[in-house]
Amino acid sequence: MFNFAKTAVLMAAITALFIVVGGMLGGEQGMLMALLMAVGMNFFSYWFSDTMVLKMTNAQQVDERSAPQFYALVRELSEKAGLPMPKVFLIDEDAPNAFATGRNPDNASVAATIGVLKILSNRELRGVMAHELAHVRHRDILISAVAATMAGAISALANFAMFFGGRDSEGRPNNPIASLMVAILAPIAASLIQMSISRAREYEADRGGAEISSDPEALAHALEKIHNYAQGTPFQAVEQHPETAQMMILNPLTAGGLAQLFSTHPPTEERVARLMHMAKNGEYPGAN
């Protein structure tokens, strides 16, 4: 119920922002058109955003024949978590990362890059995929899918406002400065909405992953490795579609310093510290 409420709040907030941008582009008619588009896009997001995200990241589906060890690992963790077997995908990217998508546990997919399989031990990979399956179990993946789709739409509308301007409710051209401000501020606002929910969601998935794998230390080590390797290895598909970055186990586009304040993910060092504390004190479900 809590995750359903989070989804509703996120969809309502981003829909409202979408309508406001539409109003600045075309007055009352623009708001009405934006509202109709938002309803359609939310419907589309619910049913098809997982397919879009997998296509954006160039993910290729695998099975027990094409990727036997990885597929078996996901199946073992799924059974332990009490979840239906998700579809399994690999992404031909050296950047180490992973994500989950799909509207519910019965229609879920998990994906990992070739890079993450190369750098992690089997124990660490179990921790990562357990984290992703925790997202599935918590039904967080719908939030990520809707956020990615709507954030991309808001950015597109904002860019349209910057280059083509818009009209007010009386049909007069908008102030170009106002259009520029919309182009700058609307995507930032969309990111802040995502950030307010995503950080807590990642902590929950870390804890849930520790429960599924019974090994928070392995996930902590995996996060450290992914963080260190990702610094010099660009995730090309995510750079082309930055709206998908917030779905990854670590945001590949996050910078340090002040930019960390606007990240959809908590600081890696904080996540690692929490997991190591859980491992040391046995403060996680499934601990002996």
Curated annotation (Swiss-Prot):
Binding note for cofactor: Binds 1 zinc ion per subunit.
Top-rank EC class of the record's enzyme: hydrolase
InterPro entries associated with the record: HtpX_protease, Pept_M48_protease_HtpX, Peptidase_M48
Cofactors that this protein relies on: Zn(2+)
Membrane topology: Multi-pass membrane protein
Domain of life of the source: Bacteria
Pfam family, one: Peptidase_M48
Subcellular locations according to the entry: Cell inner membrane
GO molecular function annotations of the record: metalloendopeptidase activity; zinc ion binding
Main location: membrane
Binding site for Zn(2+): H131, H135, E202
Cystine crosslinks: none
Transmembrane segments: 7-27, 29-49, 141-161, 177-197
EC number: 3.4.24.-
Active-site residues annotated for this sequence: E132
Keywords: Cell inner membrane, Cell membrane, Hydrolase, Membrane, Metal-binding, Metalloprotease, Protease, Transmembrane, Transmembrane helix, Zinc
Protein's GO biological process: proteolysis
CC terms in the record's Gene Ontology section: plasma membrane
NCBIfam families xref list: PRK03001.1
Family (UniProt): Belongs to the peptidase M48B family.
Protein's name in the database: Protease HtpX homolog
Gene name of the record: htpX
